[in-house]
């Protein structure tokens, strides 16, 4: 089939240097999947923690399903990530290093299953963010100059 994007975490690319990416599955309830099919999810401010040898995604907001009954899910509950033991151990070792964290980058459907792309990230300082903004501005100006030159 392919991939159908549910949501992106643009803030992660702004606040972190992404060093490594990997794909993980999610343990979800039925009403959560229905809400995700409607595109009602928010990855901003979410992060991954390892507890008792298991990986959990915190602060992932999935809006309650509109047509759900009293057994609807909680919007901000912690959700378990499906990763291999070696992957969890390697990520946990990197998290213990100073300045590293794991953030979700995007969520998508892959062959009918919900997947999350997580990234091993190191926080950016304020001057790094300014430097990135300068690079984007100069790149934008360059592309506009080339575009106007091609029109002539």
Curated annotation (Swiss-Prot):
Primary localization: cytoplasm
Please indicate which superkingdom the organism of origin belongs to: Bacteria
Name the segments for region: Disordered.
129-152
Keywords (A to Z) from UniProt: Cytoplasm, RNA-binding
Name the residue ranges with Polar residues bias: 141-152
Q: Name one GO molecular function term.
A: RNA binding
Q: Which GO terms describe its biological process?
A: trans-translation
Identify the GO cellular component terms for this protein: cytosol
**Stored PROSITE patterns:** SSRP (PS01317)
Q: Which family does it belong to?
A: Belongs to the SmpB family.
Among PANTHER family, the record links this protein to:
SSRA-BINDING PROTEIN, TMRNA-BINDING COMPONENT OF TRANS-TRANSLATION TAGGING COMPLEX
Function of this protein?
A: Required for rescue of stalled ribosomes mediated by trans-translation. Binds to transfer-messenger RNA (tmRNA), required for stable association of tmRNA with ribosomes. tmRNA and SmpB together mimic tRNA shape, replacing the anticodon stem-loop with SmpB. tmRNA is encoded by the ssrA gene; the 2 termini fold to resemble tRNA(Ala) and it encodes a 'tag peptide', a short internal open reading frame. During trans-translation Ala-aminoacylated tmRNA acts like a tRNA, entering the A-site of stalled ribosomes, displacing the stalled mRNA.
Q: Which HAMAP family match?
A: SmpB
The name this protein goes by in its record? SsrA-binding protein
